[in-house]
């Protein structure tokens, strides 16, 4: 079979055809597609014939005869008709510029010959959970790659320093999360870590050369076995908007250099082994919408600088070892929809303005299982329609008014009348710690 393929493919450099590929509906948007004609300032090695040979090797190495869709592979049809293959003119010559083979039952190891696809801009092999072995070093020689998606494969080994060669990368998805977390999540950190540990494939330290991916806007490394400190060079990713390292084993703390990422909108670092205090520089992330650092071992106080994150919608710091008082500055976050500070060691009183008139979008405030003292602020109010839309999209419980979850603290005094008018809220106020409680309402 391989010999006949090679014979057929020698004709394809002449009769290639240039068109968009046939791709499955499961593939992600083509963020890295090239236009029909792209002029390059640097010389480009290879040809359509070398691309053809590389595709043959890919087909054989990844069990092509058993793919879910292998239309026109192993045929004399132009490469542009092969399922998932996109051929585009590059500097006037037809070349393979994209492979869309996600969720296609690929099995085996990625061959080193993939490095011969020197014009490749998009490589999507995600959701092929029987792709195994390490990521070949040659893949990182594809310096024109714009989109690399290897999500939920069974790749192993460490990321090499050569990852820094992908200087054109916009989307890097190496995550290993195919599961609906709600199926096994019960709020217990031990259970969460046990399930996390069963998902690991990639390992080792994150190379500091990742900081050379200065055009990257989306990086997802979640649920991999990465360890050690996060490299300070992450602060060089000036175009980054989305960063997830959720469910890894990183230690140390979030680098202060992350505060330089002015375009960052989403930062997820939950379920790691982070312990150092949160850096005040996080308050410089002026476009941040979600800050998720739950289920770590972070000590120290919540930085007051987080009150400068005016676009923040979701703040989740639950299940850490945070201490000190809740910064009053958090009451100035007018766009906040939900905040989770539960299961820490926070003390002092709930800030008087927390959940006040400025925070009309606030749906959910979880402060349970801390060491908070004093009385409950009278802050029950109707939420705005925009908040209800957000709740529906995010799957957040919504009652049409702000919910405070305050059980497991040291609160005293009387329950404000505003709470008594909304009986559904009362179950979230009790019980308090032994020896504490309220003079009215449920016990």
Task: Please identify what each model-predicted range represents.
Residues 15-50:
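Bacterial Sec-dependent N-terminal signal peptides
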Residues 60-109, 178-205, 440:
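LRR flanking "cap" motifs
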Residues 93, 116-119, 128, 140-145, ...:
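Leucine-rich repeat
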Residues 99-101, 123-125, 145-150, 169-174, ...:
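Conserved hydrophobic beta-strand positions in leucine-rich repeat
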Residues 104, 128-129, 153, 177, ...:
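Consensus "Asn ladder" position of solenoid repeat domains
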Residues 176-203, 356-361, 382-401:
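Intrinsically disordered, low-complexity Ser/Thr- and acidic-rich flexible linkers and loops
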Residues 361-365, 373-443:
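Leucine-rich solenoid repeat scaffolds
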């Amino acid at each position: 079979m391989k010999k006949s393929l090679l014979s057929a493919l020698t004709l394809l450099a002449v009769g290639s055809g240039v068109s968009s590929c046939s791709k499955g509906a499961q593939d992600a948007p083509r963020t890295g597609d090239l236009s029909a004609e792209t002029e390059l300032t640097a010389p480009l090695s290879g040809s359509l014939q070398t691309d053809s040979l590389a595709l043959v090797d890919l087909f054989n190495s990844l069990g092509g005869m058993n793919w879910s869709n292998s239309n026109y592979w192993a045929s004399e049809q132009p490469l542009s008709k092969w399922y998932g293959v996109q051929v585009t003119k590059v500097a006037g010559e037809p070349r393979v510029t994209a492979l869309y083979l996600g969720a296609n039952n690929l099995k085996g190891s990625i061959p080193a010959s993939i490095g011969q696809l020197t014009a490749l801009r998009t490589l999507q092999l995600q959701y092929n959970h029987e792709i195994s072995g390490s990521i070949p070093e040659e893949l990182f020689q594809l310096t024109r790659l714009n989109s690399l998606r290897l999500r939920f494969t069974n790749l192993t080994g460490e990321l090499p320093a050569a990852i820094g060669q992908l200087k054109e990368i916009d989307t890097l998805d190496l995550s290993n999360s195919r599961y609906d977390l709600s199926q096994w999540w019960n709020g217990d950190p031990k259970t969460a870590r046990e399930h996390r540990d069963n998902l690991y494939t990639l390992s080792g330290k994150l190379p500091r050369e990742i900081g050379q991916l200065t055009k990257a806007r989306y990086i997802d490394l979640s649920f991999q076995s990465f360890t050690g400190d996060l490299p300070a060079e992450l602060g060089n990713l000036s175009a980054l908007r989305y960063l997830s390292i959720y469910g890894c084993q990183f230690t140390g703390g979030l680098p202060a250099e992350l505060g330089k990422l002015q375009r960052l909108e989403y930062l997820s670092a939950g379920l790691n082994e982070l312990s150092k205090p949160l850096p005040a520089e996080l308050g410089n992330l002026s476009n941040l919408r979600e800050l998720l650092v739950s289920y770590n071992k972070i000590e120290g106080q919540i930085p007051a600088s987080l009150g400068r994150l005016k676009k923040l919608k979701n703040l989740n710091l639950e299940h850490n070892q945070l201490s000190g008082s809740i910064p009053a500055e958090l009451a100035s976050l007018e766009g906040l929809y939900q905040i989770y500070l539960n299961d820490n060691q926070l003390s002092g009183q709930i800030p008087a303005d927390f959940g006040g008139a400025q925070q009309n979008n606030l749906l959910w405030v979880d402060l349970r299982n801390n060491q908070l003292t004093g009385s409950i602020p009278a802050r029950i109010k109707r939420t705005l329609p925009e908040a209800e839309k957000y709740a529906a999209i995010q799957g957040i419980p919504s009652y049409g008014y702000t919910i405070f979850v305050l059980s497991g603290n040291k609160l005293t005094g009387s329950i404000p009348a505003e709470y008594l008018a909304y009986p559904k809220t009362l179950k979230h106020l009790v019980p308090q710690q032994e020896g504490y409680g309220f003079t009215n309402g449920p016990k």
